[in-house]
């Protein structure tokens, strides 16, 4: 492998701004629905206001992407920061809502998978590394899963380790697949 080409993208590798914007709106709507159902329908307490604030930051950056960025084909320089914001935003939400025990924690790999399909290998490796660090961080530092502090749930350590390993394997497998077969 020639490492000098790691961060070069082929001319045909870019992420359509409209595609990224729509994906991010889908994520935002899903996040709003998930936390609203858990808080208002299931009546499980967690930091709902902080969660809405985190989601609103994602919405603000998506509005900037949609209306502030004038180019339509996003190369690494433009797309990677938004994917990084998505990683940080979802990690913050997961921190507030149970860390890796949250059933939505596997979604943390999506920004890296998007990168592997549309951006350079170097960007994908960096996002994959950051994803791994964030995954490990929210595995050990997080607020309780809604309902966990009410003795409704208890997870042994081997289960936590299994979740970490399964998400990391999914990250590596799907990233490789995207790099290998995209473009």
Over which residues does each language-model region extend?
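Generic transmembrane alpha-helix motif of multi-pass integral membrane proteins
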Residues: 89-101, 106-126
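Alpha-helical transmembrane segments of multipass membrane proteins
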Residues: 32-37, 63, 91-95, 113-114, ...
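Short, Lys/Arg-rich, polar N-terminal cytosolic tail immediately upstream
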Residues: 1-15
């Amino acid at each position: 492998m020639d490492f000098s080409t790691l961060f070069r993208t082929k001319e045909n590798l870019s992420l359509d701004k409209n595609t990224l914007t729509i994906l991010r709106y889908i994520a935002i709507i899903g996040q709003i629905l998930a936390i609203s159902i858990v808080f208002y329908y299931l009546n499980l307490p967690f930091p709902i206001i902080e969660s809405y604030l985190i989601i609103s930051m994602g919405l603000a950056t998506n509005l900037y992407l949609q209306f502030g960025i004038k180019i339509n084909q996003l190369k690494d320089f433009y797309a990677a920061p938004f994917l990084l914001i998505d990683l940080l935003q979802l990690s913050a939400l997961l921190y507030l809502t149970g860390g890796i025990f949250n059933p939505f924690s596997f979604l943390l790999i999506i920004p890296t998978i998007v990168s592997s399909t549309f951006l350079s290998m170097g960007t994908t490796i960096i996002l994959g590394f950051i994803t791994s660090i964030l995954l490990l961080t929210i595995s050990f530092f997080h607020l309780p899963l809604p309902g966990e502090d009410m003795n409704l749930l208890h997870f042994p350590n081997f289960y936590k380790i299994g979740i970490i390993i399964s998400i990391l394997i999914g990250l590596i497998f799907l990233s490789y697949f995207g790099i290998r077969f995209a473009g």
